[in-house]
C-alpha cells in the first residue's frame, strides 16, 4: 500500500501514455506458472547447460515434486529450506513449495551446519 502523503516525484518523468498505477489480478505465483504452461506450453521456461525445459514440462515436474512434498508432510505455511545450486531442481523445488503454500527459504548450498 502506498502512503498517499508520500510525493512520487518520479511520476513527472513518465510519458503521458504511461499509467502511474498498474492493477494486477490477485493470483498465486503457482497460478502464474500454470497459466504460462496453458498459454505457451512449448515455449522454453528453463535453459540449463544444453537442457531446455518447456513450460508444460516444468509444470509437470513441479506438480510431481509438489505431490511428493505433500506426501512427505509439507503443508501450507510450513517453511521449506532449499539448499541447491542454481539448477533446474532448485527452480522445480521452489515452484513446488509455492504450489503447496509453503514458505520457501532459499539457502546457500555452501553453508556449513553452524551457518544454518
Spell out what each predicted region is.
Residues 1-26:
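Flexible, non-catalytic linker and terminal segments flanking ANL/adenylate-forming cores
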Residues 21-25, 30-34, 42-87, 91-95, ...:
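Conserved AMP-binding/adenylate-forming core of the ANL superfamily
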Residues 98:
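Anion (oxyanion) recognition and catalysis
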Residues 101:
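Structured binding elements
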Residues 107-109:
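Short beta->alpha connector loops at strand-helix junctions that form conserved
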Amino acid at each position: 500500500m502506498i502512503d498517499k502523503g508520500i510525493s512520487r516525484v518520479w511520476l513527472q518523468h513518465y510519458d503521458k501514455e504511461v499509467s502511474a498505477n498498474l492493477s494486477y489480478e490477485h493470483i498465486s505465483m503457482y497460478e502464474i506458472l500454470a497459466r504460462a504452461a496453458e498459454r505457451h506450453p512449448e515455449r522454453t521456461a528453463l535453459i540449463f547447460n544444453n537442457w531446455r525445459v518447456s513450460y508444460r514440462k516444468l509444470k509437470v515436474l513441479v506438480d510431481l515434486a509438489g505431490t511428493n512434498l505433500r506426501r512427505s508432510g509439507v503443508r501450507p505455511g510450513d517453511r521449506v529450506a532449499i539448499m541447491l545450486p542454481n539448477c533446474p531442481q532448485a527452480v522445480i523445488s521452489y515452484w513446488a513449495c509455492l504450489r503447496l503454500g509453503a514458505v520457501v527459504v532459499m539457502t546457500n548450498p555452501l553453508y556449513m551446519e553452524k551457518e544454518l
